[in-house]
Amino acid sequence: MPPKKKKITAIIKLQINAGKATPAPPVGPALGQHGVNIMEFCKQYNAATESQAGNVVPVEITVYEDRSFTFVTKTPPAARLILKAAGVEKGSGTPHRDKVAKLTPAQVREIAQTKLPDLNATTIEAAEKIIAGTARSMGITVGD
């Protein structure tokens, strides 16, 4: 007889700095209300993301009926990667009027390759268009 599948009670999505998960908010309250061992999650998450230090890494935590959990880390948000590549602190308040930085097509391609597994795109060209659109909506121009 095959083993029984665990019943899922919750799926929690968080964005946490890589290698810096602590039981303090926002991690503690989000996991605590589902009865998850918070310290155990923090240790596992920090070990899994220590190589990406300095980035915000989204994580999807699946909580099961017996209070056990599994998690999947995603790629950093496109907006964060764009800001880092452009070397600016934040995007423009009025993106269509004020431009704050410029990205080269090579930088856009690099970000698109990083984000491809999490994007709704099958080709690198489609991923580049998505990243370029995100950059434009932040007041960052794309071109040579």
UniProtKB/Swiss-Prot annotation:
InterPro entries in alphabetical order: Ribosomal_uL11, Ribosomal_uL11_bac-typ, Ribosomal_uL11_C, Ribosomal_uL11_C_sf, Ribosomal_uL11_CS, Ribosomal_uL11_N, Ribosomal_uL11_N_sf
PTM statement from Swiss-Prot or TrEMBL: One or more lysine residues are methylated.
GO biological process, one term: translation
Keywords, in A-Z order: Methylation, Ribonucleoprotein, Ribosomal protein, RNA-binding, rRNA-binding
Subunit-level organization: Part of the ribosomal stalk of the 50S ribosomal subunit. Interacts with L10 and the large rRNA to form the base of the stalk. L10 forms an elongated spine to which L12 dimers bind in a sequential fashion forming a multimeric L10(L12)X complex.
Function: Forms part of the ribosomal stalk which helps the ribosome interact with GTP-bound translation factors.
The name this protein goes by in its record: Large ribosomal subunit protein uL11
Source organism of the structure: Frankia alni (strain DSM 45986 / CECT 9034 / ACN14a)
Lineage, broadest ranks: Bacteria, Bacillati, Actinomycetota, Actinomycetes, Frankiales
Originating gene: rplK
